[in-house]
Amino acid sequence: MSKLQLSIAVGNYDRMRPLIDGDVQIDGVDPVFMLQDPEEIFFRAFRTADYDICELSLSSYSVKTAAGTSPYIAVPVFPSRAFRHSSVYVRADRGINSPADLKGKRIGVPEYQLTANVWVRMFLEEEYGVKASDIQWVRGGYEDPTRIEKISLKLPEGVSLVNAPEGRTISNLLADGEIDGVIGPRAPSCFDRGHPQVKYLFEDPQKAAAEWYERRKLFPIMHTLGVRKTLAEQHPWLPGALVKAFEHSKAVALTRLSDTSATKVTLPFIEDQLRNARRLMGQDFWSYGFAENAHVVDRFLARDHAEGLSSRRLQPAELFHPASLESFKI
């Protein structure tokens, strides 16, 4: 029997390289990998379902699943996870010295429903009492003024969201002082260029994130992996094969990362970072699997619905193909 030739769109991450390079195989699949930025993958996945298998924004996927309009069903593989205390940038000349100072401010976002922004709004409210309705939100492309919100939104009463002026980007508005800050998964270019009046909200984002993790035990999930529903129906073995292969690929990547005799990453002190991550979060700090991550997914789904993004309160198991909820053990 010939293997299924399937398109797989993912980011070019170390945890994907063993699969991409052919060191790890997906049982029964001849993969055609398409290495793309998340913004392109998500736009094409949710607009035209271009791929057989692809990385999915957790927020956009949850919104689509709640509405019953997702062409994909996920498996508990999480290509992207990130603490987002480093995702809040503010003007240094606006008296913003703590999260509470964001109340009443104009804050730019590339898209309101981005997964990173949901996590940020969660900890701003739970830890610092800053509600979404306390902020005036301005939506626009970071660097391209034509960027649009991928998914139509119906926000709760009291939440103010306006579009950036025509032809203006969020980075330009921040640099020119027309907004007070930015929340998003990428640094605005004015920050990267060293604008003297643009800074992190948290003076030490890594310390703030570690303290938050110690309190909440949440390593935020950004992206999951989706397979076209029709494919999963035709080939019920496929979801399990994907979990097995992507888990193996990640394990190979972590083994390589742990070999610090000649580091595989072009970054000094990586061995200390790895040791600190394991000390804080355990050996399997970047876990896949449903049981290991159900509490993280549940917290996200509760917030996504509370913000008016998902039309109903989903349960974690609803996001994932039933055959992928458990894996074999030896």
UniProtKB/Swiss-Prot annotation:
Pathway: Xenobiotic degradation; phthalate degradation; 3,4-dihydroxybenzoate from phthalate: step 3/3. GO terms for biological process: phthalate catabolic process. GO terms for molecular function: 4,5-dihydroxyphthalate decarboxylase activity. It comes from the Bacteria. It catalyses: 4,5-dihydroxyphthalate + H(+) = 3,4-dihydroxybenzoate + CO2. Keywords: Aromatic hydrocarbons catabolism, Decarboxylase, Lyase. Its EC number is 4.1.1.55. To P.putida DHP decarboxylase. This is 4,5-dihydroxyphthalate decarboxylase. It comes from Comamonas testosteroni (Pseudomonas testosteroni).
